[in-house]
Amino acid sequence: RIEQMKETPLEQTTKIEAQLIEFRRLLHSEPELSEHEFKTQEKIIAKLEEFGIPYRKVGKTSTIATIKGKNAGKTVALRADIDALPINEDLDLDFQSNNPGVMHACGHDAHTTMAMGAAKILNEVKDTFDGEVRIFFQEAEETFEGAKKIVADGGMEGVDAVFGMHNYNTIASGSFYSGPGDLFSGCDTIHV
């Protein structure tokens, strides 16, 4: 019921843009490898607590935030990966990785930040929608283990749909692409 909202999602996002940029840069400067995202989880939990959003820890370092709407309804999950890669960051940034040999080369710091922004806004407008939104801050995406832990800990129980996202440089900024079924749902390891 977007007509019940006092501000559009874009207006709400613009209001918290500086806060989200700061959060993303903090995550970027302190990356952690799969299944070692302990400080990352602490930062996520601190932000969820600041925003008054209920959560629970699952797996080793995953967190599920839960936002319940006005009435019962469908349950939708948004998934953001939180782990970094074992790559040295050679960029000269004010918020460059402080963890030698580890960086957010795949944009998981941005994914986590976007999910956190969505969580904040959805929590503020929860009286305008029915159902439940779960935000999965998923550990160990790069090792293909994190989603299994969320499922094993019951995170998917009652979920009607899951939306994950990834930055993609051929899609214009401010736009998104979606389609039916799985998109980009494959993984493999190549040894050279």
Q: What role is predicted for each listed range?
A:
Residues 93-103, 110, 127-192:
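Histidine/acidic-residue-rich, glycine-tolerant segments that coordinate divalent metal ions
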Residues 5-104, 109, 113-129:
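Acidic/His- and Gly-rich active-site-bordering loop/insert found
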